[in-house]
């Protein structure tokens, strides 16, 4: 296959440090030359491991990943990138560069999600604070794993799209299918199942945040 002249793509994601979020541009460049794959931009070990997860997920989703030189830059480079939430935006960026994803009006969508080797999306930690921070920074649309959809959808004024796998994301971005944006009332998220009771003791650290929540709750009684 001939390499397209447009082999650079940018997909939005977010890095979370504590409760503070930083918008990340996942830049993917694909060129001819010695086949290789590098991830730069201060990634931790789990982000570096995304190479094999993403490569296999793309292949098992039915897309051909040609032998190319692939460089993934997570910008800005001075912010440490942690966790597996960049799997989805990296995969989408590669498929944009290969022109598997052809629609151009998706640049304003933020994406987070961990990929399984079969292309399915696994739930992630920190979806709610990521979505809160994304809204503060002007993001209106987010694609994330289906399992995180409900918690994220309590945020008013945002379109939250939950996807089950990489194929579903590709079809949605190409306009082949529709994914309904979920909206959930805050009260619905407070209904706890009988099988599990949540407790602040389960939260590691964040003492000042827990104290602030306790004070806020006391003031509403």
For the regions a protein language model found, what residue spans apply to each?
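Peripheral, non-AAA+ core regions of ATP-driven protein-machinery
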Residues: 3-221
């Amino acid at each position: 296959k001939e390499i397209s002249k447009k082999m650079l793509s940018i997909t939005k994601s977010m890095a979370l440090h504590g409760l503070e979020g930083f918008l990340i541009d996942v830049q993917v460049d694909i060129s001819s030359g010695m086949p290789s794959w590098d991830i730069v931009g201060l990634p931790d070990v789990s982000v570096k491991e995304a190479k094999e997860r993403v490569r296999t997920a793309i292949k098992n989703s039915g897309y051909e990943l040609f032998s190319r030189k692939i460089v993934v830059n997570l910008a800005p480079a001075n912010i440490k990138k942690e966790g597996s939430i960049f799997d989805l935006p990296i995969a989408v960026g590669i498929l944009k560069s290969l022109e598997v994803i052809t629609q151009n009006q998706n640049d304003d969508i933020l994406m987070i999600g961990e990929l399984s080797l079969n292309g399915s999306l696994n739930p992630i930690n920190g979806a709610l604070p990521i979505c809160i921070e994304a809204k503060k920074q002007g993001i209106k649309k987010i694609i994330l794993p289906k399992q995180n959809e409900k918690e994220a959808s309590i945020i008013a004024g945002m379109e939250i799209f939950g996807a089950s796998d990489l194929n579903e994301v590709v079809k949605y971005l190409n306009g082949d299918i529709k994914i309904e944006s979920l909206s959930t009332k805050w009260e619905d998220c407070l209904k706890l199942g009988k099988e599990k009771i949540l407790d602040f003791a389960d939260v590691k650290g964040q003492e000042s945040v827990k104290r602030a929540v306790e004070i806020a709750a006391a003031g509403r009684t």
